């Protein structure tokens, strides 16, 4: 049982570090109101998690990669906070684009990941 917690924890720490690195890189390249870093992370995360759940990985790999790594990599809470910040700035065009594209592209990416993993 302890090994399961270690797998999830180690995977999550790696995923969070990758998310942080991508976020720093993207924010340094594109100065815009649209949260491209979080958008990219969540869309690629949707694809990768879709792929992972549709493959025949063993339960330990699922814990490490699916629950751990992907849980640390993707960020639903940052998506919500950035959405609220756009609302508070009254930047409704970017807000609705961000929310709509995140959900639509996330579903499409997850579907493609699942189809490729089958």
From Swiss-Prot:
Native source organism of the sequence: Listeria innocua serovar 6a (strain ATCC BAA-680 / CLIP 11262)
Annotated catalysed reactions: fluoride(in) = fluoride(out)
Pfam families with a match to the protein in the record: CRCB
Keyword Transmembrane: yes
Gene: fluC1
Annotated InterPro entries: FluC
Regulation: Na(+) is not transported, but it plays an essential structural role and its presence is essential for fluoride channel function.
HAMAP family (UniProt xref): FluC
Spans through the membrane: 5-25, 39-59, 61-81, 98-118
Single biological process term from Gene Ontology: cellular detoxification of fluoride
Protein name (record): Fluoride-specific ion channel FluC 1
Protein topology in the membrane: Multi-pass membrane protein
One Gene Ontology term, aspect cellular component: plasma membrane
């Amino acid at each position: 049982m302890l090994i399961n917690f270690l797998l999830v924890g180690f995977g999550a720490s790696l995923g969070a570090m990758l998310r942080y690195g991508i976020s720093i890189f993207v924010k340094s390249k594109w100065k815009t109101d649209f949260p491209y870093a979080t958008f990219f992370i969540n869309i690629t995360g949707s694809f990768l998690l879709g792929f992972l759940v549709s493959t025949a990985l063993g339960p330990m790999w699922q814990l490490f990669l699916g629950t751990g790594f992907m849980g640390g990599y993707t960020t639903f809470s940052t998506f919500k906070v950035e959405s609220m910040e756009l609302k508070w700035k009254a930047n409704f065009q970017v807000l609705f684009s961000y929310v709509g594209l995140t959900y639509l592209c996330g579903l499409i990416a997850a579907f493609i990941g699942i189809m490729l993993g089958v």
